[in-house]
Design a protein with these regions (language model features):
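EAL-family c-di-GMP phosphodiesterase catalytic domain
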Residues: 1-14, 18-28, 35-44, 95-97, ...
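Inter-domain helical "communication" segments and dimerization helices
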Residues: 1-4, 8-14, 56-63, 84, ...
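Catalytic core of bacterial c-di-GMP phosphodiesterases, primarily the EAL and HD-GYP domains
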Residues: 31, 62-137, 213
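Binding-interface segments
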Residues: 51
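A general structural motif
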Residues: 84-88, 117-121, 147-149, 172, ...
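Charged helix-capping and loop-helix junction motifs
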Residues: 105-109, 137-140, 189-196
Length: 297
């Protein structure tokens, strides 16, 4: 299994940030969902879907969230100049980090490291798992995050098991719909009416509502009619994704040393069902000679 040092020596930067734009239908403003691309000699490139799974569901959640936020806040001053149309950079976060209080600690550390960063440009995106938690505790934690200047969002809203009416209990800036909502929207006229009413309900709460990828003009038109504010740019569309090497760390050596010097925090794991195969991406061990990106076959 290749070590971080071997990966860097091959000319590959192990971990970089990429941006996936969220396009508004009625304005030039944009949001940007950010994610880490993990490059491994053995595993290849672990992109957006895999990263979101790791960040939400495995024991790497704390480690990746901390690294993600720190790297993002370091480059935000430059991004604000280069891409003024983007009002928020969104970071996916596992709901249990909010409940445990670890997320607040991560944000405080990031602000202390980069006080020149614009907290108001960063949005914390929680999965809809948060709706199954104690809403009083969740609301208190989210209000604390917002008091620090950060925005908040929730994703995967509207799937079969999502308690959608609990969304009204949380302070949110953005809501990202589950793909199941789009399937219902495109099924028939009745589906379009139902989805339109659902989106209207969410917007009455004071949030902006965004859809997953819209791959064709018919879907985009239906989303507009339903009152959706915009949609996520396709992750496979080159024009919507900023290449990783444009906003990579200063040097590959620095990145490798950062990874080698840090040990993942794994206290968020409560049972073995959450450590799916992708949690084998242990990106921080004792030193650069032994740190691995990837696990045993």
């Amino acid at each position: 299994m290749a070590t971080v040092q071997q990966t860097v020596e091959s000319g590959i930067i192990p971990i970089v940030i990429e941006l996936n734009d969220v396009v508004f239908f009625e304005s030039s403003e944009r949001l940007s969902r950010t994610f880490l691309t993990i490059n491994s000699l053995d595993l290849g490139v672990l992109g957006y879907p895999q990263y979101r799974f790791v960040a939400h569901r495995t024991k790497q959640a704390y480690h990746l969230t901390e690294r993600h936020l720190t790297k993002l806040m370091r480059i935000i001053p430059a991004l604000v100049v280069d891409r003024p149309e983007i009002s928020s950079y969104i970071v996916p976060v596992y709901a249990r980090l909010l409940k445990s209080g670890e997320l607040v600690d991560i944000l405080l550390k990031a602000l202390a490291l980069y006080p020149e960063a614009y907290a108001g440009r960063v949005c914390i995106e929680l999965s809809c798992d948060v709706l199954f938690e104690d809403l009083d505790e969740v609301r208190e934690a989210m209000e604390q995050i917002r008091s620090m200047g950060f925005k908040t969002a929730i994703s995967e809203v509207g799937d079969t098991f999502c308690p959608v009416f609990r969304v009204a209990e949380l302070p949110l800036d953005y809501v990202f719909l589950d793909p199941a909502v789009i399937t219902r929207l495109m099924a028939d006229d009745a589906g379009e009416r139902v989805v339109g009413s659902f989106i209207s309900y969410l917007k009455d709460l004071g949030t902006l509502v965004f859809a997953p990828d819209a791959y064709d003009e018919a879907t985009t038109a239906a989303l507009r009619r339903a009152g959706c504010d915009g949609c996520v740019g396709s992750i496979v569309s080159g024009e919507d994704v900023v290449p990783a090497d444009e906003i990579a760390d200063e040097t590959a050596d620095e990145t490798a040393q950062e990874i080698a010097d840090e040990t993942p925090v794994e206290e968020t794991v409560e049972d073995s069902t959450e450590t799916a195969p992708l949690d084998e991406i242990t990106v921080g061990e004792a030193d650069a000679d032994t740190a691995e990106i990837g696990g045993d076959d």
